[in-house]
Amino acid sequence: MIPGEILTGDDPVEINAGRPVRTVLVRNMGDRPVQVGSHYHFAAANPALDFDRASAWGHRLAVPAGTAVRFEPGVEREIELVPLAGARVVPGLRPESAGPLDAASGTRIADTATIEDISGFQGEGS
């Protein structure tokens, strides 16, 4: 065995098995490529990305850990998102969206002014 080596079985490993998946249409409105990592809170991604941020609140990309998705300028594509798990608290990242993803009352923070107040989020559907 090599230090750090991971030995797996012969069968493929299914990622996000049994997790609810939602599809979101994303367009890069900027003039530079944007890359988003696997476990980044997608609703707080680069403001140049135009998509339904309220729908993406509390979700991450449905891709293997350690990978990323690149959005080229002017290109529109569908992506799949899965809910962030664990304690559902996002520290850091964008300060406007940091903290618990779910309000104590059971309502989502995205349903309050918090999501609209994130600087750089512009216009309908962004």
Curated annotation (Swiss-Prot):
Cell location: Cytoplasm
Keywords: Cytoplasm, Hydrolase
SUPFAM superfamilies: Urease, beta-subunit
Recorded metabolic or biological pathway in which this protein acts: Nitrogen metabolism; urea degradation; CO(2) and NH(3) from urea (urease route): step 1/1
Matches recorded under InterPro entries: Urease_beta-like, Urease_betasu_sf, Urease_subunit
MF GO annotations: urease activity
Major place of residence: cytoplasm
Enzyme superclass (EC): hydrolase
Annotated EC: 3.5.1.5
Cellular component per GO, a single term: urease complex
Gene Ontology biological process terms from the UniProt entry: urea catabolic process
Matches recorded under Pfam families: Urease_beta
Catalytic reaction annotation: urea + 2 H2O + H(+) = hydrogencarbonate + 2 NH4(+)
Entry-linked HAMAP family: Urease_beta
Subunit structure and binding partners: Heterotrimer of UreA (gamma), UreB (beta) and UreC (alpha) subunits. Three heterotrimers associate to form the active enzyme.
Family the entry assigns: Belongs to the urease beta subunit family.
Protein name (record): Urease subunit beta
Organism expressing this protein natively: Frankia casuarinae (strain DSM 45818 / CECT 9043 / HFP020203 / CcI3)
